[in-house]
Amino acid sequence: AQLDRRTCTLTKGAEGLRRLVVGLGKKCILAQTLWGLCQSFQEGQERTLAFCWLYALALVLALYFDFSGYTDMALGVGKLLGFDLAENFRWPLAARTLTDFWRRWHITLGWWFRDHLYRPLVRAAGGKRTGCLLLVWLLVGLWHGAGWNFLLWGLLFGLLLAAERLGLGGWLNRFPPLGHLFVLAVLGFGAVLLTGEDLGQSLALWGGLLGQGEP
């Protein structure tokens, strides 16, 4: 439909160029620098609690700047061509609950899974939302890759999102700073799973995050 309605204006072109430059900066400067730091960690031997958490949070930031950088570039090119594409990231790292995070991160993918899988499953299951939520998140994990790491990643987020629906979310909203720390911590565990070579390596790093690494 936008093919018939697209408009190319100086204002839209300037905004498109700005988004393109921002995306390039995120991808080529911030993300690449952070990936380099993560690679240095992997090649080193230190596995202290603080170092493992710095690594996990660097992974989170690297994934964010990498992915949102590509999205910004796509939005920028779209505007240069006269198209208005949907925003895909809305400050996700500022979220105070995981539910809010997933409303801000990779928004269009979330819409697709919600409309084409979750809602039809809930209707078919007679409104049993929790089981459907867990199943969809296992499928989201497999969408990211076929392996135990990705299944565990999906299970992790599915269980915690279900817990937020059952009361955890209300508690996190009452204590925003703790909610924010909770989100960042879970993202750290999740990032280790997404980027690990195999489940054994990821679980070893989880041990480091829980203080079970080398002193």
Q: For the regions a protein language model found, what residue spans apply to each?
A:
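Membrane-embedded transmembrane alpha-helical bundles that form the catalytic cores
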Residues: 1-214
